[in-house]
């Protein structure tokens, strides 16, 4: 069986930075406990590995007040920093630089009098965090129905969750532009997301089956699944680990494409490839 790996897959810069930050804190923790405020990234295997090394996940600052609290790669609302400062909690910021850029944009343009529109999932921690940098006043749109609920406004500033699909951004932005005579657009989908999506789409056209490796709660992985299903609706499979590969299905085909989300470590991708090669 022929196994082809997408040109762009696996860890992105922001995820690598967050994990490196966490392990550097382990080296210099000075006997303090280390926590992450929410899962550092959306990959359960990596989170388990961090926990095995003593880095625990907490859901609020107070639970980590006796140690060092690492801000997750998805970022957090602005008031978290203020809260930590007032409580004298030691924070280490592992926010993805691309996410931090969006936070700065919405903070700046809200102060300039713009209404902020975030294209993304309102329940995703990245979007929740971004909204917290414009006083939680953003219009968050996930689909056309959400756009219809936006009134006509004087000034609009549009940003996007870093992991949405480019097609969704293009479609919804065109609609949002009809809601104001003065619209600023910032395509804040990160380059790693675009590269992975294009690479996955091209590979799906060339193979019989697509395997997408990544966390079930990972937004960017879910987008890869959606894109591949457009090309291979019946033979696209989303897995987290090599143990979930549908081997009984793969044996009926000649070629398999493998790609992975931005929070999927190389060792998991390698395990998947090895298992398919041994079919």
Swiss-Prot record:
It comes from the Bacteria. Binds 1 [4Fe-4S] cluster per subunit. CDD domains: lytB_ispH. Belongs to the IspH family. One of its GO terms (molecular function) is 4 iron, 4 sulfur cluster binding. It comes from Alkaliphilus oremlandii (strain OhILAs). One of its GO terms (biological process) is terpenoid biosynthetic process. This is 4-hydroxy-3-methylbut-2-enyl diphosphate reductase. It catalyses: isopentenyl diphosphate + 2 oxidized [2Fe-2S]-[ferredoxin] + H2O = (2E)-4-hydroxy-3-methylbut-2-enyl diphosphate + 2 reduced [2Fe-2S]-[ferredoxin] + 2 H(+); dimethylallyl diphosphate + 2 oxidized [2Fe-2S]-[ferredoxin] + H2O = (2E)-4-hydroxy-3-methylbut-2-enyl diphosphate + 2 reduced [2Fe-2S]-[ferredoxin] + 2 H(+). Catalyzes the conversion of 1-hydroxy-2-methyl-2-(E)-butenyl 4-diphosphate (HMBPP) into a mixture of isopentenyl diphosphate (IPP) and dimethylallyl diphosphate (DMAPP). Acts in the terminal step of the DOXP/MEP pathway for isoprenoid precursor biosynthesis. Its cofactor is [4Fe-4S] cluster. Signal peptide: none annotated.
